Structure formats: structure tokens, C-alpha cells
UniProtKB/Swiss-Prot annotation:
Keywords: Methyltransferase, S-adenosyl-L-methionine, Transferase. Residues 1-61, 146-184 are annotated as: Disordered. It is an enzyme of class 2 (transferase). Residues 82-318 form the Bin3-type SAM domain. The keyword S-adenosyl-L-methionine applies. This is Probable RNA methyltransferase At5g51130. Its EC number is 2.1.1.-. The keyword Transferase applies. PROSITE patterns: BIN3_SAM. One of its GO terms (biological process) is methylation. It comes from Arabidopsis thaliana (Mouse-ear cress). InterPro entries: Bin3-like, Bin3_C, BIN3_SAM-bd_dom, SAM-dependent_MTases_sf.
Length: 318
């Protein structure tokens, strides 16, 4: 009996010892899991922060509206050309010296020169990268233009008897049409030029005068970055750079779009709060304060707004 009791006691002790060992192992295992889970969470957090920083790097900020591929963003796939070209008048550009303020990548500038036959057109933009894009597009257009010239020359020079083509194809054309034809065959690189420039702060008023000046979707960015004073400076410089009777074509952004872009920089956020001159007063300012004589709403005659460019376009005459 005594032995049996001793054996039972020893067995219970061993069971308790085993249970204690198991519980200790369990605690240790749990303790080991905690830092592992914490490490995993930390690693996940670090990866999340890394991804966020990558996203921030990828999300470029354009405080001057100098968006990359701006025209691709604004023009829909089913549009063959910039719809604003349809409201511009040929007589404002044909054989004229023109200036495009805030030209971005130069697509609109080049198309105006090609379609309307400018004598010269200069595109200026504050962003070096956009001007580089503009030069690239110009070289591309010139190559395309030059690739068609040999066949045109051949067809116009073959056959003195007119079987293959007349030697004087412009005889039956009006003077305006003949001028347009000569402008189209002229190398675009001799007509179009681009340069980096902060128009508000650096434009020298002793420079050449222009017959037509464009400022398309630019006023908001001047306004947000330089306030009311910067906007008045822009309008005043444009007026002084225009020839008498010259045309200023403006596409102002509505006030609502100011609100959407006010936080692109500390400067724009600060200026947004102090702006007094709203876009609905621009006509009054340009006519009564700056000195333009007349204004024409170019978009009022359109039956419907084109997708991407549904803003008002105004033409002021000096």
C-alpha cells in the first residue's frame, strides 16, 4: 500500500512538471510570436510608407498649370483637332506676327501657324520641360511637312503643256488663298519659335509688337501665383505689346476652377484668399481700365460646347 501511494504521488508530480513545462513553452512561444507580429506590422507599415512616398513622387505638382500632355488630357479621342481652332478667325493670323502666352507643349501654337499661315508666332512658357516638348513637336511637324514636299514639287513641275499639272497653280486663286498656300509650303521652323519665359515678371516692353496675342487657359495660373497685381500686369503688358487694332484672344478659367487648384502650393493658397478681381469682371477691367475698345464672345455662336474645351473664349481689339 505504501509503495502504491508513493508511486501515485511521483506520477502526479511528473504530470504537474510536464504541465508546467508545457505552459512555460506556451508562454515563451506566445512571447516569441508578439515581436514577430510586431515586426510584421512594422514591415507592413514601412512598406506602406514607402508606397506612399513613391505615390507622392509620382504625383507631380504643376503650380503654374504646366501639365504634361495637357492637350491629350483636354481633347477627347473622337476629336481630330483642337476645337478652339474653329472659333479663331483667319484674318487675325494670316501674314501676322503673333504671340502665344503659356504655350505649354506648343501643339496649339504649331496648329495655328499651319492652319492660318502666320508670318511668325512665338510661344512662351514658364516651364523649361514644356518648351523642350514644344521644340520636339516642332521638329516632328517639320519632318512631316518636308516628307510631303518632293511629291508636291514633282506634280507641280511636270509637263509644260499642263497634262501633268499647271506651272501656275495659284492663278485661279484669290490673293488670300495664294498667301495661305505659300505659308503652308514654307518651313514651319521659319515661322514658329519657342522660348522659356516668365511673361509677368520678365517680358521687356521694348520688344517687337504683335498683331495677335493669345492667352488660353492661363489667367487662373497667373492670378493664383501673382494675385490681382500679377493679373493686371499681364493685361497691361499684353495691351502695350499689341499693335494698334491688334487682337487679344483670352480663354479665362471660371472661379470654380480656382477653388479646385488653390492648394497646389503655399503661394496659390495664400493668393486665393486675397483675390478680389473675379473672372466675371475681366471684361470690365480690360475695356474700362486697360483700354481695349471692343470685345467679342467667340463661343456664343457655337451650337454646343466641345468636350474638354467648354470655356468662354473672348477676343478684345486694341
Amino acid at each position: 500500500m505504501g509503495r502504491d501511494n508513493d508511486q501515485k504521488k511521483n506520477k502526479k508530480k511528473r504530470n504537474r512538471s510536464n504541465e508546467n513545462e508545457k505552459s512555460v513553452e506556451k508562454v515563451v512561444a506566445n512571447e516569441e510570436k508578439v515581436p514577430t507580429q510586431q515586426k510584421q506590422k512594422q514591415q507592413q507599415g514601412q512598406q506602406g510608407n514607402c508606397n506612399q512616398s513613391k505615390k507622392k513622387k509620382n504625383q507631380e505638382v504643376y503650380p503654374f498649370g504646366n501639365y504634361r500632355n495637357y492637350y491629350g488630357y483636354r481633347i477627347s479621342n473622337d476629336t481630330d483637332e483642337d476645337p478652339r481652332l474653329k472659333v479663331l478667325k483667319k484674318e487675325w493670323f494670316e501674314g501676322k506676327d503673333c504671340l502665344d502666352i503659356g504655350c505649354n507643349s506648343g501643339i496649339m501654337t504649331i496648329h495655328i501657324a499651319k492652319k492660318f499661315g502666320c508670318r511668325s508666332i512665338l510661344g512662351v512658357d514658364i516651364d523649361t520641360s514644356r518648351i523642350e516638348d514644344a521644340h520636339w513637336h516642332l521638329r516632328k511637324f517639320v519632318r512631316m511637312q518636308n516628307s510631303t514636299k518632293p511629291s508636291e514639287k514633282k506634280s507641280s513641275s511636270e509637263g509644260a503643256d499642263g497634262v501633268h499639272g499647271s506651272k501656275e497653280p495659284s492663278v485661279s486663286l484669290s490673293n488670300g488663298e495664294a498667301k495661305a498656300d505659300s505659308a503652308e509650303t514654307k518651313d514651319l521652323s521659319q515661322i514658329v519659335s519657342f522660348q522659356k519665359e516668365n511673361f509677368v515678371q520678365t517680358r521687356n516692353l521694348d520688344d517687337n509688337r504683335y498683331d495677335t496675342i493669345l492667352c488660353l487657359s492661363v489667367t487662373k495660373w497667373v492670378h493664383l501665383n501673382w494675385g490681382d497685381d500679377g493679373l493686371i500686369t499681364l493685361f497691361s503688358k499684353i495691351w502695350r505689346l499689341l499693335q494698334p487694332g491688334g487682337i487679344f484672344v483670352m480663354e479665362p478659367q471660371p472661379w470654380k476652377s480656382y477653388e479646385n487648384n488653390r492648394r497646389v502650393s503655399e503661394t496659390t493658397a495664400m493668393n486665393y484668399r486675397t483675390i478680389v478681381l473675379r473672372p466675371d469682371r475681366f471684361q470690365e477691367i480690360l475695356l474700362d481700365k486697360i483700354g481695349f475698345r471692343t470685345v467679342e464672345d467667340l463661343t456664343s455662336s457655337l451650337s454646343g460646347a466641345s468636350k474638354g474645351f467648354d470655356r468662354q473664349i473672348l477676343a478684345f481689339q486694341k
